[in-house]
């Protein structure tokens, strides 16, 4: 068995069955069943769902949506990712799988916005997300670091 890695989940009935494992252990606000069912019905081939398989079973998942700030009052301008419903099965929690999912999203090099759910503020703090408060509610934001050592064509001689 290879080292677990993050992969884009297929929108199909096998994934739907895998999602049912999460229903009993998480809060209703983390449920993705209805969201996945809607994508199956719409025959949407671009899956917003990502997960980690271990031993052939889905053990951790999240959804990522590409968004564009249309004037919302928060610290992101332009294109960003919205990370929703990150969840790891209880047996596999505190083993780095949630962090692995977040690091995958960070690797896409877009700012990330997420809402801390179910006592997860410490998790987001540990991963260098910054808390943001706006009238609509609180959330966390992460910005990619800019590489100060990068030389552009205009700067090179």
Swiss-Prot record:
GO molecular function: acyltransferase activity, transferring groups other than amino-acyl groups
Keywords attached to this entry: Acyltransferase, Transferase
Keyword Secreted: no
InterPro entries xrefs: Acyl_CoA_acyltransferase, GNAT_dom, YlbP
Domain N-acetyltransferase: 9-146
EC numbers for this chain: 2.3.1.-
Gene3D superfamilies per UniProt: 3.40.630.30
NCBIfam families per record: PRK13688.1
Name recorded for this polypeptide: Uncharacterized N-acetyltransferase BCE_3967
Organism: Bacillus cereus (strain ATCC 10987 / NRS 248)
């Amino acid at each position: 068995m290879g080292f677990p890695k993050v992969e884009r989940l297929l929108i199909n009935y096998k994934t739907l069955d895998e999602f049912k494992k999460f229903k009993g252990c998480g809060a209703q606000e983390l449920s993705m069943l209805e969201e996945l069912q809607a994508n199956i019905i719409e025959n949407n081939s671009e899956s917003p769902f990502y997960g980690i398989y271990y031993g052939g079973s889905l053990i951790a998942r999240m959804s990522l949506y590409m968004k564009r700030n249309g004037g919302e009052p928060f610290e992101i301008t332009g294109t960003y990712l919205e990370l929703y419903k990150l969840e790891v099965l209880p047996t596999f929690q505190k083993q780095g799988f949630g962090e692995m999912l977040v690091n995958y999203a960070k690797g896409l090099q877009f700012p990330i916005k997420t809402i801390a759910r179910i006592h997860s503020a410490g998790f987001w703090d540990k991963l260098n997300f910054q808390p943001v408060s706006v009238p609509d509610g609180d959330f966390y934001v992460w910005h990619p670091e800019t590489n100060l050592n990068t030389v552009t064509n205009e700067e090179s001689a």
